[in-house]
Amino acid sequence: MAVPKKKTSKGKRDQRHAHWKAKARVAARKALSAGKAVLSGRAQGFVYPMPEEDGEAES
């Protein structure tokens, strides 16, 4: 069974955690930006399904 030979230093551990948290921060910022764009109506890259109205068939 594979076992690490030496203990990982706190500095190396903190580097990995910082990188992981930075990636999470970027993803959260992008998600917030996309949400704001959708709510403000300035989003161009989204396709919204248009509800079909029954009133058009009666004319």
UniProtKB/Swiss-Prot annotation:
Protein name per the record: Large ribosomal subunit protein bL32
Source species of the chain: Synechococcus sp. (strain RCC307)
Family: Belongs to the bacterial ribosomal protein bL32 family.
Biological processes, Gene Ontology terms: translation
Keywords, alphabetical: Ribonucleoprotein, Ribosomal protein
HAMAP family the record matches: Ribosomal_bL32
Designated gene of the protein: rpmF
Pfam families on file: Ribosomal_L32p (PF01783)
Source lineage: Bacteria, Bacillati, Cyanobacteriota, Cyanophyceae, Synechococcales
InterPro entries: Ribosomal_bL32 (IPR002677), Ribosomal_bL32_plant/cyanobact (IPR044958), Ribosomal_zn-bd (IPR011332)
